[in-house]
Amino acid sequence: MTKRVAVIGAGPSGLAQLRAFQSAADQGAEIPEIVCFEKQANWGGLWNYTWRTGLDENGEPVHCSMYRYLWSNGPKEGLEFADYSFEEHFGKQIASYPPRAVLFDYIEGRVHKADVRKWIRFNSPVRWVSYDAETAKFTVTAHNHETDSTYSEDFDHVICASGHFSTPNVPFYEGFDTFNGRIVHAHDFRDAREFEGKDVLVMGASYSAEDIGSQCWKYGAKSITSCYRSAPMGYAWPDNWEEKPALEKLTGKTAHFADGSTRDVDAIILCTGYKHFFSFLPDDLRLKTANRLATADLYKGVAYVHNPAMFYLGMQDQWFTFNMFDAQAWWVRDAILGRITLPKDKAAMLADVAERETREEASDDVKYAIRYQADYVKELVAETDYPSFDIDGACDAFFEWKKHKAKDIMAFRDNSYKSVITGTMAPVHHTPWKEALDDSMEAYLQN
């Protein structure tokens, strides 16, 4: 009897899984029946932009955390698919920091070519997953918004690829409830032009704080104040951008910081991170981990140690993205196809997790972290037939990216890198990022 595999989510990780199975089928392998459940009306996950916030057209929590004018905050050379280059997709090499629409088109191009859309049930959020140890089957309950019906089906494996950047972590501070300006989490941030002429407080010191603050600066915010809990971002910011230690409270429109300083602000943007949140999973199947490189309870970073018939994709903190999701998806595919044997001993799988955590914690150096994840990708690629690519070259692109950011945080996107797939150097974009106000694909591809 043919196995059945449920994939939850048709974002970059879920699409990688579909592509992995399609690749095996193309080579003559007998693959399971694949059903991918996607809550949105289209694929792409976070990259599927919507103007909506709060609830979507079906009354479901909006998944998208993307905003207008978003450009990649890392070089595309670090995420390029090994089996589908940017040059193949666009017919030429493109600059190194594409806007969201360009990356979405690239993601979509590969899965169109692979013809995997037939496996996806759109507008179909998963409501619940359960496991029966006697039958060794998962029961997945989903809702079809097109027919307004709820149904259940059984599967041999479940692959959770729902992501972990869609459920915001929203803190409360004294004075929030009486602040007369706008308070918005990064998840619901959509357009930097809303903050033109305003004094903006950006709470957080990670990538979303850096990028959203930069967007607001680019599109005319009067000033940016960013605050941090542990360490400042520390870049050479423009004159109207200041970093402060942790926010303590608000009185009226005045923000009070841990160093005793104050700042009047018109709007607050919470770049305070996201939660691993799986409302459709019972406690015994639900991953519980911090956002880190070595995820808790996942053997090889993907197989759930408490039930290794279940897998998770893309749950790590990420330097590598699309190509790491591919490496994971190919590995999971081969585990399901019986090409890779999982340890039968749970203790052995937990030991693997512990060893990865120990190695991650050995250094807090950024280069070490990048190399750590690169070694993880190499490990998975070596165990499958995923096309090998220059992973060390991708690391070099990341290292150069960090240098360029330190040199000029508002101009790092004007640099170019060499493709680790084709070896072609990216052209310099026709317009400096600070001046490129049109983020459309048509404008971007005019090189």
Swiss-Prot record:
Recorded effect of pH on activity: Optimum pH is 8.0.
Residues involved in FAD binding: 13, 38, 40, 46-47, 63, 73, 126, 318, 321
Leading EC class: oxidoreductase
Catalysis: reaction(s): trimethylamine + NADPH + O2 = trimethylamine N-oxide + NADP(+) + H2O
Binding site for NADP(+): 71, 73, 173, 205-206, 208, 229, 413
Gene3D superfamilies for the chain: FAD/NAD(P)-binding domain
Key words, A-Z: FAD, Flavoprotein, Monooxygenase, NADP, Oxidoreductase
Cofactors named for this entry: FAD
Annotated thermal dependence: Optimum temperature is 30 degrees Celsius.
InterPro entries recorded: FAD/NAD-bd_sf (IPR036188), Flavin_mOase (IPR000960), Flavin_mOase-like (IPR020946), FMO-like (IPR050346)
Any one Gene Ontology molecular-function term assigned to this protein's record: N,N-dimethylaniline monooxygenase activity
Signal peptide per UniProt: none
Enzyme Commission numbers on file: 1.14.13.148
Pfam families associated with the record: FMO-like
More info: The catalytic process consists of a reductive half-reaction and an oxidative half-reaction, via the formation of a C4a-hydroperoxyflavin intermediate. NADP(+) undergoes a conformational change in the oxidative half-reaction.
Entry's family note: Belongs to the FMO family.
Function field: Catalyzes the oxidation of trimethylamine (TMA) to produce trimethylamine N-oxide (TMAO). TMA is the best substrate, but the enzyme can also oxidize methimazole, indole and dimethylamine (DMA).
Name of the molecule in the record: Trimethylamine monooxygenase
